[in-house]
């Protein structure tokens, strides 16, 4: 009995004491590659948490210009903590430099040579996330200016101790609170891991408390990190799906948003206003288009405060999102084959499952962009569907590139919903979104009986828009993002946008739309009222966020200088962009707005176009029909025999005919509208 008691006392004394573990010395190569200096940790409590965990990291590094260096700590579960990146100016060396969460002086405000105690750029307490302390930790060092001078790691050590700094304590918030428990696991890129979520929102004007029950939703989810470049940032964005007790995805409404299973927590790390995405989606919604609904919230993961996030709807087919028909592998003919499809121009990363190249190069001479499958994905589409959607897009591009592209019937207009393309252009050019036409550029196609055209949108991904990018002219008030000039970039803008602007119909219509919107929802008064109201809602939580992530007044890729040191400063910076960019577009957006009344009373010759051509079962007729007027249609075969005859009312200049299963070959379509006649030819497979 006494021996057991003595052993327990010895073990508890051992655990209660600080313990340090060191790495070996070694060269820091001058090659721009991360070099790992492993630290083997053993004999500690299995779980690193607020009772016993990582307390400090001390390093000794020699290098003639330490501002060349990026230094991180990588935990056994893959969590990466930024210690110091590109700090120190022209000074040298880190000598007996120790990082503590509790020190007031931040390393990025210090001067080289660095010695003594500093607060790291990240937070050490994020390592104490209930992961197993025992294992291999890595000090990662990269010389970001290769080919100049090398350095040397003279040793480093990690100290684990009782009661380390446990982070920021969130007690209550005016925003919804999200608690996530991953059961001690790190959150990977892929696949999703199981977790449990509590979403708390007590309603307008009510405070939400960290101890409240999850009254909006409480239950299992699958969660992963998401994004491309954003995966490298300290504050991660997450994708998650809501699951039932058996692990199957299940649709659930969240904080006033329609029921669905797939959602996103956007970290908004580079956008310190937390508003650039939201402003863009708000504008799209005000213009009558679908864009992701959003709600700001504060998140705690495994007991650790993570800051402000934006809960977003993921772009997805569905009645509450992109409202197009469900396309199944069985839909291989007739109207069922014609929709719905979601496509995009985007990076070839992440969950890309195929696509096809544009038929024509971009106007700047760069690489030809690809059109990628989003819904259904390339693994689900069957050959007939792939052939159909590719041929439709090819027909659109051929019509747009052709010499008669401005023609109402022979050009591109029958293939696209023009007004959706105009709204997409306006939103992305107002924001001068340098990614907007070449990355995360979504469009979709409806079934023929629902219009059948290519609809541009939803708009997506504006973190580095609205003047928040210091490259490719993203912070320059003048110019257009669809005239992207960087030919060395792997992702280019399709030729569509330049060509569309060469059509007076399109540019004049876009100009009229802009002028109309500037008198209302896009006026400075309306936009500033929205921005100010959102900033007021976020004001309490932003203070906590920027203690957790102390990046105000600090460069974060790709913020342009100067870097405002207050939240009010970054909000004013956004409003300045709105003022200056809108003024520039007022003066420079192409086109002339011709009042509708000037076109009234003109006699228009009857013209008609049949598409698609070749046709399958359904045929659309587009013509200069009077709205609601009765149009008589006859279809003849090559022998002159009448195969089909009926009268239909015209709607928006279009008529859908379903002639049935007649012989294949060339068909002549005769159209009568009042005392005017016209014909069209179509080949039917």
Give the location of each predicted region:
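Loop and turn regions of beta-sandwich accessory domains that flank beta-strands and are enriched
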Residues: 19-167
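Residue-level detector of buried hydrophobic side-chain packing
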Residues: 71-73, 139, 158, 180, ...
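Conserved NTP-binding catalytic cores of kinases and kinase-like/nucleotidyltransferase enzymes
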Residues: 166-274, 279
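Internal "kinase-insert"/substrate-recognition segments embedded within catalytic cores
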Residues: 180, 241-247, 253, 258-267, ...
